[in-house]
Amino acid sequence: MRKRTGRRPPQKNNKFPIYTKEFLVEGLTHDAKGVARDEGKVIFIEGALPGERVEAQVVKQGRRFDEAKTKKVLIESSSRVAPACAHFVECGGCQFQHLIYPDQVEAKTEWLSGQFRKLAIGDIELLSDHSEAYRRRARLSVFTKGGEHQIGFRARSSKDIVNIANCLVLTESLQSVFVALKERLHESSLTSRIGHVELLEDESGSSITIRLSREISATDESDWMVWASEVGVNLYWQRADESRISTARKHYYYVDGLNIQFHPQDFIQVNASMNEKMVEQAMRWLAPTKEDIVLDLFCGSGNFSLPLARRAGEVLGVEGLETMVEFARLNAQENDLDNVQFIAADLTKPAPKVLKSKKVTKVLLDPPRSGAFEFLETLVKFKPEQILYVSCNASTLARDAEYLIANGYVVSRVSLMEMFPQTAHAEAMMLLQRK
């Protein structure tokens, strides 16, 4: 068979000649890649913005699209800015630092609109706060390269780790902790025994959890504990055979005037100020009264349940992790709320009997990225007046909302929640009303 001429080399075993070419960027993907076309084929270009002409290197070829990396911007967009972080080009933590913040929000809003195009929604509202130094939690990898101890995040589209000097989206306190930890790692001989570290800031202070791949000596552990005390952080060790660390220290944060305790390895929203705004908006949209019985699904340690309990007649929180349910019960007790009940249940399975006995009037759910599709058949049988859906994955929210609409609900309000500025992550809140 003759080879075709005038076309890009065909893919073979994922290996092909890498080539560089000029492209005119027409759009932007949900993960912040520029969209161009070459001979009718779509090209996704890392680091390119709409309206730009760039010189890009095609690094991956597929049947439906190719992937490329910007090498030089020939005609620059007026929306382009110099990234504040020196590691932006390599680090996979942020995707949008080269785009002015208002246009970041606009891009996410347009993407949400595309995801919800079948739902007949109105305008998408915006809930936002400051765009830097917001992240109160982070997980970083530790490794040794060329005899140098390094720490950082995964590189873009790679399993490689980028060694970073600091991270500007961390809270200012955690930025200081990060710098101190990096210096300590350079002085330590334990780097080869450390898999990763987790940084956390809450109302009790800053903490570091070190995940060990191999055991360390009592002397080394003692030296690290002395260092942690001098730096002013709480230090936890997680051995390779431990799934959960033990801690006598109380970790907590405030929301809606309530004290929420949690285990340092359990889920909490990483953006504290946006979490406060999100809960306030949820209470305003759902507007529970003493006449309401509210069901809070995937309730965690009570982030929504407890504010709901301050307003509703009765609240029932359901969570899959027993450890988080225990904290939720403790939080209800510590905040003197006796009209809220928590149960542990797998929400991918038939509803527990206690749910079937309740005449639920309103529902709030905040599921993982996979959504809540398995529970929706049960949910619509409750016939709640309103359903407030908080989502970290717009595609599964759109899927679940389609089911709810087909079963008697209409979309009342939708909001983009800017939990992760400088990144391509878009969180959403949707209120559905029963017809």
From Swiss-Prot:
Residues 10-72 form the TRAM domain. Its EC number is 2.1.1.190. S-adenosyl-L-methionine binds at Q269, F298, N303, E319, D346, D366. [4Fe-4S] cluster binds at C85, C91, C94, C167. One of its GO terms (biological process) is rRNA base methylation. It is an enzyme of class 2 (transferase). It comes from the Bacteria. InterPro entries: 23S_rRNA_MeTrfase_RlmD, MeTrfase_TrmA_AS, NA-bd_OB-fold, SAM-dependent_MTases_sf, TRAM_dom, U5_MeTrfase_fam. The keyword Iron applies. It holds the Pfam family tRNA_U5-meth_tr. It catalyses: uridine(1939) in 23S rRNA + S-adenosyl-L-methionine = 5-methyluridine(1939) in 23S rRNA + S-adenosyl-L-homocysteine + H(+). The active site is at C392 (nucleophile). Belongs to the class I-like SAM-binding methyltransferase superfamily. RNA M5U methyltransferase family. RlmD subfamily. Catalyzes the formation of 5-methyl-uridine at position 1939 (m5U1939) in 23S rRNA. NCBIfam families: PRK13168.1, rumA. This is 23S rRNA (uracil(1939)-C(5))-methyltransferase RlmD. It comes from Marinomonas mediterranea (strain ATCC 700492 / JCM 21426 / NBRC 103028 / MMB-1).
